[in-house]
Amino acid sequence: MRSGYLYALGAFGLWGVLPIYWQLIREVPALQVVCHRIIWSVLLLVPLLSWTGQWPVAMAAIGNPATMIRQVAASIFLAINWLAFVWAVSNGRMIESSLGYYINPLLNVLLGVLLLGERLRHGQTIAILLAATGVGWLSWHVGTVPWIAIALASSFCLYGLAKKTTSVPPLVSLWIEATVLLFPAIVYLTGQHLQGKGAFGVHGLRIDGMLLASGIVTSVPLWCFANAAQKLPLSTLGILQYLGPTLQFLLGWWVYKEPFDATRMIGFFLVWTALSIFAWDLVHQGSPARFSTTNDPPASDGNQGPLVGTPKAASELEQ
């Protein structure tokens, strides 16, 4: 059990501090960062699949049309989530991105009601109404809809829904999704370089090295989460998942000095209160994980595993 906590803290802690990594390469346009992340993730996962002996599983998944339809849909939501997160971090919207990951579990529950016919418990109803009030407050008083938070939460949610009925292991799933995006990523980066707009080889060895390592920072938290998911109860993971957005929030507020006035504080307080009620309901009711599949943890960035109230595929997505 102790090792499970260490793996969970490693996964959620890394996801929480990954904004620092993307901030260090903010000179690179967000779409180019995402394309590099796709390419180097594919190349890193190839030997990992060989090492873990999962190529037969990968080939079986590719040969299953129903599985591939879901994987292609998931890859689209994965790309949207990665792009929104990297753009937010690079443009001083880290606090808003943390809001997206805070409200994501509640959005999963709401989608379960709307699309899957699930029933809300009283605690869940109160939590969703409070969170919606918080988001509405921020939209009204700040003057703009927090579209980054909504984009991150909804892409996370739809990613989990796309993978709801699949049982593809996490490394295989991430490799397939990244491979689906590989050709568009290569075409886009090639076009950017031909137009003289490519970032690789332009900003120095540090930036180039960090782009190359983007596959590692994508895969390591996923590996940690996959181990944690095998060793800890889902309710424990459901609580620990909030470490990631909390670290993101603290980075944005304390380290990067993003604006957080009294108006924003009220909106976040409503959301945090909603999450406290949601967590209490989760612990006392022992609710099963939403959108979970037998073997597939949530995805990062870029954006978190088979969590109660979160898509199991979140670990590939976050940051």
Residue ranges and their predicted role:
Residues G123-S139, I150-L152, T263-L282:
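Hydrophobic transmembrane alpha-helices of multi-pass small-molecule transport proteins
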Residues W87, N104-Q124, T246-M265:
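C-terminal transmembrane-helix exit sites in multi-pass transporters
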Residues L99-I103, P170-V180, S219-W254:
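Helix-helix packing/entry segments at the starts of transmembrane helices
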Residues E27-Q32, L83-G100, W223-L240, P259:
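Structural motif at transmembrane-helix junctions in multi-pass transporters
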